[in-house]
Regions:
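Conserved Rossmann-like nucleotide-cofactor binding loop
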Residues: 15, 38, 259
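Mid-domain catalytic core of redox enzymes
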Residues: 2, 26, 225-332, 337-346, ...
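A conserved FAD-binding loop/helix module that cradles the flavin
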Residues: 412-435
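Glycine-rich FAD pyrophosphate-binding loop
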Residues: 24-49
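FAD-binding beta-loop-beta segment adjacent to the flavin cofactor pocket
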Residues: 321-327, 380-407, 411-414
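Active-site/ligand-binding neighborhood in enzyme catalytic cores
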Residues: 111, 120-233
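N-terminal Rossmann-like FAD-binding beta1-loop-alpha1 element of flavoenzymes
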Residues: 5-32
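Dinucleotide-binding Rossmann-like beta1-alpha1 core, especially the glycine-rich loop
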Residues: 50-132, 159
């Protein structure tokens, strides 16, 4: 019989790695199985031709996040954190607007003065809501229009919601937006501008530091190990199957997206429960990373409020982390959320770059194809869970039909939205639950 682990964890994103780290630190025998060829999940990194490292999908954290900095400190890597006031802006009606401070808002003449005031007061109205359940039955549009009117919604919010949630724009409940506004309102420093933090070389480096820490304490991590099914007896799981291996364990934790977990359990669990996992919808993301000779603008995070623009925004990473760290080149991310049924999902990398370029040149007329030194296109099928109205009523919890198997995944972080900070929080919480069971 092959050896039995105390805990077998599926997925080496931040939730899986955090749980593995906590448990192996306490002396449990842990094995992590990751389908991909690298750790970090959506926060994984890649290298350009000259070895410059970067994220596949951009991440930063806010100055009110607590779990990431705690972890960074514990791993002794505080020196790798870069913090800067963020420079955010908006592209609307063919021009750029700065939107980093209250004063910028007053200059936003695309809205009437009354509407600017309504937009400015929104943060205060939002803070008055203490119980998110009271707005869970509303769509984002219904809720925001009631607070700041149709014109503000149309100009400022609708293009962002549409580019973020694509075909699900009318389905997502208001809690998602409420959470975003409350959080962003609390991340400002004493001058009223927002502070953001980034990890040198990308969050994937932090994930790799966790791998080293897990291995130091005797834990194991196996890459290219896609779990295909489970072996169960009565109400207990005994083992997981991968293409090469059968892995036995006492406790099991599943951290991928619900549809992936549903496929793994398909033949072993009751259909009603498996279908409940499939009830949660997801959007995919295509992220284009451009390495450029020249800078596009001086804004880090440019929201594009132009109904014809197919990306949620232009994130010029080197307006946050200095170009010196990238051999004096400039890095821009273009992110698009879409249903995987969308024809754009099937574009080749080359088609996607051409598609992006025609839109970028409309915004930045000086930009030329010769600016692009290198590019990469990354695709994530389950990038954003869609939290529809009444989501808390149907989202599956951490339990499975098997007493020794648990789920902790991005779609359960609700009412918060996804993020590395919460992945770490959830990984710690589920590790506690599992440790308590092992100690019985």
């Amino acid at each position: 019989v092959s050896q039995q682990y105390d805990v077998v964890i599926v997925g080496a994103g931040f939730t899986g790695l955090t749980a593995a780290y906590q448990l192996s630190k306490q002396g449990y025998r842990v094995r992590v199985l990751e389908a991909d060829n690298a750790v970090g999940g959506l926060a994984g990194t890649f290298e350009f031709a000259d070895g410059v490292r970067l994220e596949k999908f951009y991440h930063h954290w806010f100055n009110n996040d607590i779990y990431v900095p705690e972890l960074v400190k514990e791993l002794g890597m505080e020196g790798d954190v870069i913090t800067l006031p963020s420079r955010t802006g908006m592209y609307f009606n063919g021009r750029m607007w700065k939107l980093s401070t209250p004063l910028d808002l007053l200059r936003f003449t695309a809205l009437s003065f009354v509407d600017r005031v309504r937009l400015g007061l929104l943060v205060f109205q939002v803070r008055r809501i203490k119980d998110w359940r009271s707005i869970e039955h509303l769509s984002i549009r219904q809720w925001l229009e009631s607070l700041c009117g149709q014109r503000v919604y149309k100009v400022v919010w609708e293009p962002l919601i549409r580019s973020k949630f694509s075909v699900y724009a009318e389905a997502v409940n208001a809690v998602w937006m409420w959470k975003k506004l409350v959080l962003r309102g609390s991340t400002r420093n004493d001058k009223g501008s927002e502070e953001l933090a980034y990890f040198k070389g990308g969050f994937g480096r932090l994930a790799e530091a966790m791998v080293s820490a897990i291995e130091k304490t005797g834990g194991e991590i196996t890459l290219d190990a896609k779990v295909t099914s489970v072996i169960a007896e009565a109400d207990e799981l005994k083992a997981l199957r991968t293409a090469r291996d059968t892995v036995h364990g006492k406790k099991f934790l599943f951290t991928p997206a619900f549809p992936i977990i549903a496929n793994i359990f398909e033949s072993a669990a009751n259909a009603e429960w498996v279908n409940s996992l499939r009830r949660v919808n997801y959007l995919g993301n295509m992220c284009l990373v451009l390495r450029l000779k020249h800078s596009l603008s001086d804004t880090y995070w440019l929201n594009v409020n132009d109904p014809g623009f197919p990306f949620v925004g232009v994130i010029e990473h080197t307006n946050f982390d200095t170009p010196e760290n990238y051999e004096r080149t400039h890095i821009a991310f273009l992110s698009r959320y879409l249903a995987v049924e969308d024809e754009v999902w099937g574009y080749s990398d080359e088609e996607y770059v051409n598609f992006a370029l025609q839109h970028l040149q409309r915004m930045f007329p000086d930009m030329d194809r010769s600016w692009i030194l290198e590019h990469r296109v990354w695709r994530a099928e389950y990038a954003q869970p869609v939290t529809e109205r009444g989501y808390s009523q149907y989202v599956p919890n951490e339990h499975t039909p098997f007493s020794n198997a648990f789920i902790s995944t991005m779609a359960q972080i609700y009412p918060e939205d996804r993020g590395t900070n919460y992945a770490i929080r959830e990984g710690r919480a589920i590790a506690k639950t599992i440790a308590a069971q092992l100690d019985k």
